[in-house]
Amino acid sequence: MGRGVYTLALRGLAPLIWLWMWRRARRAGGQWELFAPARFGRAGARAPAPLAAPVWVHAVSLGETRAAQPLVQALLERGLPVLLTHTTATGRAEGERLFGAAIGRGQLQQAWLPYDFPGATRRFLARHAPRCGLLMEREVWPNLLAAARAQGVPMALVSARFSASSLRQAGWLGQALREALAGLDRVLAQTDEDGARLCQAGANAYTVTGSLKFDVALPEAQLRVGHAWAGATGRPVIALASTREGEDAMFIEAIGALQAHRAATPRPLILLIPRHPQRFDEAAAQLQAAGLAYARRSAGSGEPGPHIDVLLGDTLGEMPFYYAAADVAIVGGSFARLGGQNLIEACAAGTPVIVGPHTFNFKDAARDAIAAGAALRAPDARTALDWALQLLAEPARRQAMSEAARAWTAAHAGATRRTLDALEDWLG
């Protein structure tokens, strides 16, 4: 499929794509502005004047925005103007939370990435005229990269990852993807394997700079509050972190096995933290239907009472708090076939980690964390919960895993510096 056929297909499928996004937006809440002028590369009536020659960073959603934090912060500290684009409302909200001060002083602007129509991408680049574009992780769009080439905007894929399954799935885009990847001026890969697969798919060359996720600084205030909160509960805590579709039901069923521990003193408290806010109410309904006593973190009622089985983590931006509060973290996305969620943040907090069998989005990180003694891999949700209970009974083993987790994340830090070094001639 060449780029022309890709564009025709995109135009034909656009109504279905917009319907899917509308449904997602309706569940998630927030201001998605699916048909705002900016989504088509146009300046709206209230759009601010663009920054002069900004460094443009695209972070599609929540996870990518968090991962981009150390890079964006480093650019801001150098005094550079930054244009930060997103596709989802959760990503944009996280950007506002992380970089509110820079937005307030006019050094950073946020915008929607336009849909990948040729005219929209041309208008976007002509309006903002970035000195360079940095696409986070996997955001390769054929028409966007073609427009950047035509307008002389150098483009890099940073903290790039590309799994074996991504390589297989890329085949249907054919020539359009090969041309897009070949049009990247630089590919800064997380690992040699990621870079090699990107070259198989069409990129010309790559440099390994590592994952920016290892450089994300966890807020000390949240860590302190999390530790204090856990101490005040007087109970051991297991976090079910970043659970995805279908996993809440698995774990809620497994939590039933904790009934045998009701007589234990103190009884374990479960933190259930769905990955996406649109599923908070759904998880609450499942807990209610299962007959589990639960409270919602958003209710702000302080430490849950001893009768509470589960605290539903229905807040955004508090993952460091949850990890600091937990004695053990079971990281979701890896028990359903979804590739896993970020385990690096939990390890950075010094929390022992258990992952499931499906970690292809974090293949190297999961493998290395397990080898370092920072994490365990369980075959299913029930086993993961059983292992977490065993760890609660073995403080020396938990402490060893905690120390290994911190050492492992510290050993892999430095991707921000390496990324900046690789882009130095673009940044001026």
UniProtKB/Swiss-Prot annotation:
Task: Provide the reaction this enzyme catalyses.
Answer: lipid IVA (E. coli) + CMP-3-deoxy-beta-D-manno-octulosonate = alpha-Kdo-(2->6)-lipid IVA (E. coli) + CMP + H(+)
List the pathway annotation: Bacterial outer membrane biogenesis; LPS core biosynthesis
Intracellular or extracellular location(s): Cell inner membrane
Question: Which residues participate in CMP binding?
Answer: P274, R275, L316, G317, E318, N342, L343, I344, E345
Record's GO cellular component terms? plasma membrane
Which residues carry out catalysis?
A: E64
Q: What is its EC number?
A: 2.4.99.12
Question: From the Swiss-Prot or TrEMBL record, what is one GO molecular function term?
Answer: Kdo transferase activity
Q: Does the keyword Manganese apply?
A: no
Primary location: membrane
Query: Which UniProt keyword terms apply here?
Result: Cell inner membrane, Cell membrane, Lipopolysaccharide biosynthesis, Membrane, Transferase
Q: What class of enzyme is it?
A: transferase
Tell me a GO biological process for this protein.
Answer: lipopolysaccharide core region biosynthetic process
* Homology family: Belongs to the glycosyltransferase group 1 family. Glycosyltransferase 30 subfamily.
Q: Which PANTHER family match?
A: 3-DEOXY-D-MANNO-OCTULOSONIC ACID TRANSFERASE, MITOCHONDRIAL-RELATED (PTHR42755:SF1), 3-DEOXY-MANNO-OCTULOSONATE CYTIDYLYLTRANSFERASE (PTHR42755)
Q: What does this protein do?
A: Involved in lipopolysaccharide (LPS) biosynthesis. Catalyzes the transfer of a single 3-deoxy-D-manno-octulosonate (Kdo) residue from CMP-Kdo to lipid IV(A), the tetraacyldisaccharide-1,4'-bisphosphate precursor of lipid A.
What name appears for this protein in its UniProt entry? Answer: 3-deoxy-D-manno-octulosonic acid transferase
Q: What is the lineage of its organism?
A: Bacteria, Pseudomonadati, Pseudomonadota, Betaproteobacteria, Burkholderiales
**What gene name is listed for this protein?**
waaA
